[in-house]
């Protein structure tokens, strides 16, 4: 890909940066914008927010994340999402309408595919149908859509391939790896390439890797683990035609949940951010 990322102004982080200038190491980089519906986020408000972002970003490439599937995160730290399948599909349709003819990167539902491994048979089938319906709507836009497949130690290559096929991967640009996780870029790269080889369809999917917090790789802890570091800066210069970009999908400094000294999931913590910066190699 030959795109230039959109670099947003972090107006809501200016005070933190004044107190901790090192955090500019994060705020100077392009980050993703996450969208969903909830008690304080109506579908209409979300649609208007997306439109404003796209207008500000034009002609540059913003990264958007859809994160609103019913029973999100299986009710764990990042629980929430739409109240019903109908509400969710309405949200997806409005999301697509908000895109217009723009071509942003869209990361579709972090962890929602691998989570099907932990769902009952009927619930898993229902989620699959919902994903396929969403993919059909998203495929009618100009967006570069990537279905999230989790981290490299979650699903085997064969299982990941099977799920992606069932979710109609051929209708979108490809898949995303390591969203909000910590696995080293080299590990993610091999996993993604193996999936691409395994699919072996007429149109081989492309993939992107979240490098926001993988500078020191992963350990056995998934929630605000100690000793992690920011990873490779966002770029489309990956030296591999199947790897579209290294992205900061998870905003470095945003918490994984109220674990290991972190605040509620999604809340920014200057202490978490500073740790990631200080541990950078």
What are these regions (language model features)?
Residues 39-47, 85-88, 124-127, 157, ...:
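Solvent-exposed, acidic/flexible segments
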Residues 50-54, 92-96, 131-135, 161, ...:
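Generic structural signal for well-ordered alpha-helices
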Residues 2-98, 251-276:
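N-terminal carbohydrate-binding/catalytic regions of secreted carbohydrate-active enzymes
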Residues 32, 59-65, 103-107, 142-146, ...:
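Structural preference for beta-strand elements that scaffold enzyme active sites
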Residues 56-60, 94-104, 133-145, 198-204, ...:
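A structural motif corresponding to the C-terminal end of an alpha-helix
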Residues 80-102, 110-142, 157-159:
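Active-site cleft segment of glycoside hydrolase catalytic domains centered on the general acid/base Glu
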Residues 73-78, 110-122, 145-151, 176-184:
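Active-site-proximal beta-alpha loop/turn segments in soluble metabolic enzymes
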Residues 8-27, 152-271:
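Surface-exposed substrate-engagement region within the catalytic domains
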């Amino acid at each position: 890909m030959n795109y230039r990322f959109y670099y947003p102004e972090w107006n809501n982080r200016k005070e933190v940066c004044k107190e901790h200038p090192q955090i500019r190491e994060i705020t100077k980089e392009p980050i993703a914008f996450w969208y969903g519906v909830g008690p304080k986020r109506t579908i209409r408000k979300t649609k208007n927010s997306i439109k404003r972002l796209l207008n500000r970003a034009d002609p540059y490439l913003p990264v958007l994340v859809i994160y609103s599937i019913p029973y999100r995160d299986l009710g764990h730290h990042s629980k929430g999402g739409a109240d019903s399948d109908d509400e969710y599909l309405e949200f997806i349709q409005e999301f697509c309408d908000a895109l217009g003819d723009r071509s942003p990167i869209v990361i579709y539902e972090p962890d929602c595919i691998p989570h099907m491994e932990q769902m009952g048979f009927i619930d898993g089938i229902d989620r699959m149908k919902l994903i396929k319906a969403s993919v059909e709507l998203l495929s009618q836009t100009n967006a570069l859509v990537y279905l999230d497949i989790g981290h490299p130690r979650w699903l085997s290559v064969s299982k990941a391939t099977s799920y992606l096929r069932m979710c109609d991967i051929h209708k979108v640009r490809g898949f995303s790896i390591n969203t909000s996780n910590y696995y080293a870029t080299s590990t993610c790269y091999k996993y993604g390439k193996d999936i691409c080889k395994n699919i072996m369809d007429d149109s081989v999917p492309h993939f992107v890797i979240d490098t926001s917090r993988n500078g020191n790789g992963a350990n056995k802890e998934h929630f605000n683990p100690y000793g992690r570091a920011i990873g490779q800066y966002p770029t489309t210069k990956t030296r591999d035609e199947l790897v579209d970009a290294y992205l900061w999908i998870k905003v470095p400094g945003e918490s994984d949940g109220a674990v290991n000294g972190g605040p509620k999931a999604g809340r920014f913590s200057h202490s978490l951010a500073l740790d990631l910066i200080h541990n950078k190699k």
